[in-house]
Amino acid sequence: MQRAAERGLCRLIIVNRIDAEDADLPAVLTQLQQAFGKECLPLNLPAANASRVVDCFFNPSGDSDFSSVAATHQALIDQVVEVNEELMTLYLEQGEELAPEQLHTPFEQALREGHLIPVCFVSARSGAGVAELLDVLVRLAPNPTEGNPPRCLIGEGDKAVPYAVVPDAGRHVVAHVFKVIFDPFVGKLALFRIHQGTVTRDSQ
């Protein structure tokens, strides 16, 4: 988590096995907040004996297995509006209810700045919370043009200078090779993530 923070990466925590017999989910959430800070706030909460999850951001209604959906929603709103002075003024002085659409941009900003670390509860075994997690990633997670760009350098040692990566398919390729493996039939294979440009089958 610290390494991700140092690199300016957005962070999201997934708590799996919420339906395990020995699961103490309130304690898990407390431990996460103690380890990584008060920025760790649930986007959903287990409900119906961990057979499903209840949304605490888009549609904060219903009962959960622990904690209060309304209080959790309030904590999320308070955390998100702190990064946007204009929105905070509107929220505090006028007491207006903020729609999720108004919170989308400051939510992404809070993620980029490390001011919010969402916690999502799921069960890979039963599928509880999986669809909701995918919805969160689609609707709230920054895409490459919205997130913090990777920190790249051109050159080595004292001569290295920063290079600003732009997620543009038309520019020259900038990629990060994160693993090299050897296949006895194919030979050496490099696994990489493209940050800029386009790579095709016949790229040199």
Language model: regions and residue ranges:
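Structural and coupling elements of P-loop NTPases
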Residues: 1-204
